Amino acid sequence: MTHRQNFASLSSGTDYEQLANRFRPIFERIAEGAIKRERTRTLPHEPIEWLKKAGFGAVRVPVESGGAGASLPQLVQLLIELAAADSNVPQALRGHFAFVEDRLNAQPGPQRDIWFKRFVAGETFGNAWTEVGEVKIGDVITQVSPKDGRWALNGHKYYSTGSIFADWIDVYARRADNGADVIAAVHTAQPGVTLHDDWDGFGQRTTGSGTSIFTDAVVEADDVFDFSTRFKYQTAFYQLVHLATLAGIARAAERDVAQQVAGRKRIFSTGNAPLA
């Protein structure tokens, strides 16, 4: 059996309505505070915690490993519903679901099982790939170096979407010993990781897309992955999450406009009724 066939047998789908009904009450709670969070730029720590505790981050994990076994189309449907409640939240979780997808594509074995257990336990990922400053296009300055049987990670990243909410960060780096590009899975609860809420962009106001600083951050030996093994459809996956978010925004806009129009008393511009 090939690796691709192994993957095809994982998380092929479940009953969508039953799955979605697990999370819809949480989506409703998230929607209640979405406008206020956007206006006051309040990061959605609590809504993301609700989702983590409910197992939302493990919906793609196979049922036999404790997850929901959702297919990729079903994940997209859930993200659309979530985006209709608060579009910042699925964007903040985009890096998490990408890392889950990568582990789904990994070779079966104990290491993959460890990650599945972490996802089921509610642990989530942010991402830190982008660098600013003197870095050249296509290059990376952040490095991992062998140290005492582990790795030491050093570098600065920007646009670290979701990392401020996460237990782990998916960091794009380069090995100092041989120059190979790698992905380092870095635990955030350590002195060597500093996360700043300094995102000042026009959009994504509450996605936690600020600066991540790594200063001799400890990375376990098994948590550095050669970039050549990254799941091959990752670019399409990232764009798919964006499209799901946009679809949710459109759904919310349709809902809100319909509510406004339905509540109007004056329906014709030259009507003789008082203005509503």
Could you say what each language-model-derived stretch is?
Residues G201-A276:
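Glycine-rich beta->alpha junctions and the first turn(s) of the following alpha-helix
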Residues Y159-T194:
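A short core secondary-structure module
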Residues H45-K53, A58-H156, T161:
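Glycine-rich flavin
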Residues Y158-S163, Y238-H242:
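Glycine-rich phosphate/pyrophosphate-binding beta-alpha loops
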Residues W129-E131, G155-H156, R174, V186-A189, ...:
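Fold-independent oxyanion-binding glycine-rich loops
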Residues T2-R60, A68-Q77, A244-A276:
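Alpha-helical interface subdomain recognition
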